[in-house]
């Protein structure tokens, strides 16, 4: 999509960042996420919204790309929701890209999810285009 603008666009990262898993683990972690998604769905481990939330969070944690990981993670969760007959989350990406109260709440919800507390992030996934 942006390959003509940024050479790294859409390519799995091979360099270390201050966030995300080690670069050599990215592909393994994506495979584990894919396997977990299949397991969660087959075993009805979580509701669709909670599964989408966990997909979003894990994709952020993995941090597969040099840039755009938040947008990609939110899109991935929305694709899962659409595949499961739910409307996508209304993220307001323009507000998440700059410092403000909504971005702060979003970052805080991701940090809580890092500790296993998904409630705030699940609540954010409940704000869909149906509303």
For the regions a language model picked out, list residue spans one by one:
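FIC/Doc superfamily catalytic core
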Residues: 1-131
């Amino acid at each position: 999509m942006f390959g003509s603008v940024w050479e790294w666009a859409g390519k799995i990262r091979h360099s270390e960042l201050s966030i995300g898993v080690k670069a050599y683990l990215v592909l393994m972690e994506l495979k584990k996420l894919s396997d977990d998604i299949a397991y969660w769905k087959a075993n009805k481990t979580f509701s669709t919204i909670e599964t989408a939330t966990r997909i979003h969070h894990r994709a952020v944690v993995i941090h597969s790309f040099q840039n755009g990981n938040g947008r990609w993670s939110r899109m991935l969760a929305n694709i899962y929701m659409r595949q499961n007959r739910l409307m996508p989350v209304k993220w307001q990406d323009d507000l998440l890209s700059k410092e403000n109260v909504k971005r702060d709440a979003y970052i805080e919800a991701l940090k809580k999810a890092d500790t296993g507390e998904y409630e705030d992030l699940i609540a954010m996934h409940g704000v869909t285009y149906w509303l």
